[in-house]
Amino acid sequence: MDQTCEDAFALFRRCISIGVVDYLLQQAQMKVRRSIYTAQVVIWLMILQRLQPRGTLATGVEALLTGAADGLLSGCERARQKRISHRTGGYSHARQRLPKRLCWQVMAELVLRLREMLNPEGGRLSYLLDGSSLELEATPSLRQAYPPGENQHGRAHWPVLRIVVFHELETGLAEEPHWGPMYGTEAVSEQYLAEKAMDALVPGSILVGDRNFGVFSIVWAAHQRGLQVVVRLTAERARKLAGGPITEEGERPVKWTPSRFDGRRQGGMPEGAFVPGRLIAVRIGRGKSKEWLYLFTTAELPREQVLALYGKRWNIETDLRSLKRTVQLHHITARNESMMEKELLTAIGAYNLVRAVMALAARRHNLSPRQLSFTFVLNVINASWHRLQSAPDAEAYQREVFRLLDAAAEGVHPKRKKRRSFPRAAWHRRHTFPARKESR
């Protein structure tokens, strides 16, 4: 197989190989275990588990028994002789023992290698920026670390986590996630998490964000890290930046300086701080429904390209939907904080595996990765596992990989004459039992 179109599965297994994981464990001065459920096997099974519709521990064990991790098994006697139990106890204990720091290191390595594989020329990348919330199990430790929300009727039941993830604009590949409590005294904002997430990006990249991120603190943080921005502004902020009312379409050079409020919140900001850029104002929509769109950008791109770039921002909504619903991250069932974080990281790894297959399939058939359905490709991957595992040699394996990519490329979204529009509303669910107001 052409090295520029390397098999995504081989790349994942290479990053989680025995040598790489053992090296990371030794660097962290952690003990290297020789057993069936070694660190590399557990990480790989947790990724595969997230790709399955049910995603239970039993599906992870069954994947191991069918040979999904044969290349990662250690040299222990039980592994060599394939004396592996169908019970989930050993896998469950190994997941608990898995070092959280190791998960971070492996996932960071995966993101780096995927970025190199999908962007071999090293061109400038653009990232979509948005945040979301995830529901956690209502255990005492998680409720303390991630308090539930409160209102005039009392405290909610489920702990809630706030998360921010950068998604590469063309491929949808997710970068390292950052998260924190959404409520309580230690609650963190999406802007705070976004600033932390910027550290992993390559200087020169472009960040695309909505009005929630169209604030000076985000623009300043990106500017300090050598990143460029395209962010939407509120009408009031655009008016202040322009120095008066905006009545005509066009663009103008501006110097964005922080307000007194921005300066108070960002204590490390030097006196006289500012970010040079352009303010773009255009009318969007049709007929009487037209409205103003205000963008601030530090990217040296023509206005039409800046507008086209921001026009793709809505893709982050479907990216988050795929991450939360298709990879089943909307409610994390782990019952302690350490296991919850490991589940979150490996879920991002599973999501990126599907995105990598989509990108390679699109490249092979001269398509855009955004033209393919995430769920369709995930189903193709699940249906292809047994053929990949049973390939007798490298040539047969290569044929199966190409067969998988060809099948994935068939999952093109339909071209509708009129774009569908859905109201932001949900059907009411009737409950037979009364709502609970407190824990047992």
Question: For each of these PLM feature ranges, what is it?
Answer:
Residues 87, 128-129:
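Noncatalytic, basic helical substrate-engagement surface that gates or grips nucleic-acid strands
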Residues 1-59, 63, 95-98, 105-109, ...:
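Single, function-defining residue in the core of a domain
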Residues 74-98:
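Major-groove recognition helix of helix-turn-helix-like DNA-binding domains
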Residues 56-80:
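DNA-recognition alpha helix
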Residues 70-71, 100-102:
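Short helix C-cap/helix-to-loop transition motifs enriched in small/turn-promoting residues
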